[in-house]
A protein has these predicted regions:
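Short, solvent-exposed helix-to-loop capping segments enriched in aromatics
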Residues: 115-127
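Short, solvent-exposed recognition patches
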Residues: 212-308, 320-325
């Protein structure tokens, strides 16, 4: 398991809920979208450094995170502290992922993938139909007083969340993903964090420039449509809609070379405004595609299956029913 800070930290500051609001009645459902937009804004406009830990499914992983902003510019560094060393540097939408041991660096533009923060601005006015939000008082996380908010799923197609946000700044300190039976599937939390630190953008830019001796990988992402690629999705899980569809030219950044003959993979991303489902479509290859499976790691489920001459992979932080609905609704268009 790897920390996924762009997802929990994009929630990233509890909606600007004040102490008075935390002690008051549950907020109206129509305020959900406004809260989430304030989360996104607070995540972008806090300078902080800390250690972030993700645990779930018997696995634990941690990363050191620094986030700075100056005017319109955002800077971020994420360094894994477990397993194979990996560093991620971000300046606005440009992301460099660096593997020091193999001297490989992957450079991509996050905006092309419509990552989670962008989804909050994509017109998700119906969030209150799918989630119920309740304030749950105060707690402490990583030495900081925090407001607690419960985001409860209204149906079986999505999970719920419990959020802890710093009382003074609104920065998200912890998020639990809550399963269908009320169990905690995954916890993402700061074990230590300093908020309001002096921004050091040059430390991020230096890391992005120091690539001498590295093999540079630049994934080729081409916007496309399912129907253009010969596919149709007959139905969507309730509340989900398509937010991105790209053709990805796959290259393994850990290998010294890649097979240029490998066909591109079609990736379509769907979201209900809080969570996401990714559908990958690629030609079936007997040497790499084995038995169909449904596997979980923390809150993330992965479903794979063969469909004729194609291999389908569906990934999401959702209950199995959601992934099965997407996989079952995907059909190859008739000539």
């Amino acid at each position: 398991m790897l920390p996924r800070p762009l997802v929990p930290l994009a929630f990233a500051a509890l909606l600007g809920v004040t102490a008075a609001a935390a002690a008051g009645p549950p907020p109206p459902a129509n305020e959900v979208r406004g809260w989430l937009l304030r989360i996104h804004d607070a995540a972008s406009h806090r300078n902080f450094q800390g250690t972030f830990v993700v645990s779930g499914g018997g696995s634990v992983a941690s990363a050191r995170i620094s986030h700075f902003y100056e005017g319109p510019n955002q800077y971020e560094r994420i360094e894994s502290l477990d397993g194979r060393q990996r560093k991620v540097f971000r300046h606005n939408d440009v992301v460099h992922t660096v593997w020091p041991a193999s001297h490989v660096a992957m450079i991509e533009q996050r905006g092309l993938l419509n990552s989670f923060p962008a989804l909050l601005q994509a017109g998700d006015d119906g969030l209150g139909e799918w989630y119920e939000v309740q304030a749950e008082g105060l707690d402490r996380v990583a030495g900081h007083e925090a407001n607690v908010l419960a985001v409860k799923a209204r149906d079986g197609y999505r999970y719920g969340y419990r959020l802890w946000a710093d009382h003074d700044s609104g920065l998200l300190l912890r998020v639990d993903v809550i399963g269908e039976h009320g169990d905690v599937l995954e916890t993402s939390a700061f074990s230590d964090v300093s908020i309001g630190v002096r921004p050091q953008p040059e430390s991020i830019m230096q890391g992005m420039r120091k690539l001498d001796g590295y093999r540079i990988v630049r994934p080729v992402l081409t916007p496309t449509r399912l129907d253009t690629e010969g596919w149709v999705l007959r139905r969507l899980a309730p509340g989900f809609r398509e937010v991105s569809c790209v053709s990805r030219q796959i290259e393994n950044p850990r290998e010294a070379s890649a097979d240029p003959a490998l066909p591109p993979v079609i990736q379509t991303i769907y979201s209900d405004g809080l969570t996401y489902v990714s559908v990958f479509i690629e030609p079936y290859r007997s040497d790499s595609h084995r038995q169909p499976m449904l596997a979980s790691l923390g809150a993330t489920l992965t479903l794979t299956q063969r469909q004729g001459d194609w291999w389908i992979t569906v990934v999401g932080d959702t209950p199995p029913a959601t992934l099965k609905m997407f996989a079952g609704a995907l059909e190859r268009k008739k000539p």
